[in-house]
């Protein structure tokens, strides 16, 4: 076996199978596991997916939201054990693979048109 095949077979054990199909422009809610002392809780983080990178076990998404007038972006490793759940709230209609231009927009200009032809 080639080295690539060996790596893919090892990574396949750690891939999550219950992830929804996520597209750039979608509004999603990510449940993030937070450990405080000996307690563990799930903190929701809701925002628009502005970028998707890589594939396989290294797949990441960048989620942006505006909190108290300040734009906050977080990068999530999709197959990480810290990501408890991902729920799609609404589908977005965009023509770009990366929505970095939303960083420069303010107020209603940051809205993304909703798409109805893809199921949630």
Curated annotation (Swiss-Prot):
It comes from the Bacteria. GO terms for cellular component: cytosolic large ribosomal subunit. One of its GO terms (biological process) is translation. One of its GO terms (molecular function) is structural constituent of ribosome. Keywords: Ribonucleoprotein, Ribosomal protein. Pfam families: Ribosomal_L19. InterPro entries: Ribosomal_bL19, Ribosomal_bL19_CS, Ribosomal_bL19_sf, Translation_prot_SH3-like_sf. This protein is located at the 30S-50S ribosomal subunit interface and may play a role in the structure and function of the aminoacyl-tRNA binding site. NCBIfam families: rplS_bact. HAMAP family: Ribosomal_bL19. Belongs to the bacterial ribosomal protein bL19 family. This is Large ribosomal subunit protein bL19.
